[in-house]
Amino acid sequence: MLRGAHAIALDTKGRLAVPTRYRDWLREECEGQLVCTIDIANPCLLLYPLCEWEEIEKKLKSLSGMNPVERRLQRLLLGYASECELDGNGRLLLSAPLRQHAGLDKQVMLVGQLNKFEIWSETRWLQQVDEDIQALPEMDWTISDKLRDFSL
């Protein structure tokens, strides 16, 4: 399981040092092979272990290239998809187009989301968390059947 939020400094080449607690698991789970793409709803990146990404690709493959919305989704997610491999020091190289899309500079946040990570600029992450917390009192919790029975 991928969870937690970790502040990480990108090096000058755009490499992200994956926290030690995930390195062994990623090497065991997917031989250190990952895929990074853009998030179409937020200014961040999505980083999937290869086995998880392959499930996403199956879903994308089932979409119709004739439907403009489905085609746009395929184009963005697959067009930006970039294979990444953990190097010997547990780092991943994030391509310049991906870093540019998410506005990544020096300080980033690696945020576990169960089956994937989100990669945010630290500034945007803090803004997003602030917005999410402020929106909580106004949310309609009955909107989703899954949320209706959700408790912490």
Curated annotation (Swiss-Prot):
Cellular component GO terms, alphabetical: cytoplasm; nucleoid
PROSITE patterns named among the record's database cross-references: SPOVT_ABRB (PS51740)
Main location: cytoplasm
Domain SpoVT-AbrB residues, every copy: 5-52, 81-124
Domain of life: Bacteria
Swiss-Prot/TrEMBL GO biological process terms: negative regulation of DNA-templated transcription initiation
This protein's record includes keyword DNA-binding: yes
UniProt keyword terms in alphabetical order: Cytoplasm, DNA-binding, Repeat, Transcription, Transcription regulation
Pfam families, sorted: MraZ
This protein's record includes keyword Endoplasmic reticulum: no
InterPro entries tied to this protein: MraZ, MraZ_C, MraZ_dom, MraZ_N, MraZ_sf, SpoVT-AbrB_dom, SpoVT-AbrB_sf
Location in the cell: Cytoplasm, Nucleoid
PANTHER family for this protein: TRANSCRIPTIONAL REGULATOR MRAZ (PTHR34701:SF1)
Name listed for the protein in its UniProt record: Transcriptional regulator MraZ
Taxonomic source organism: Tolumonas auensis (strain DSM 9187 / NBRC 110442 / TA 4)
Organism classification: Bacteria, Pseudomonadati, Pseudomonadota, Gammaproteobacteria, Aeromonadales
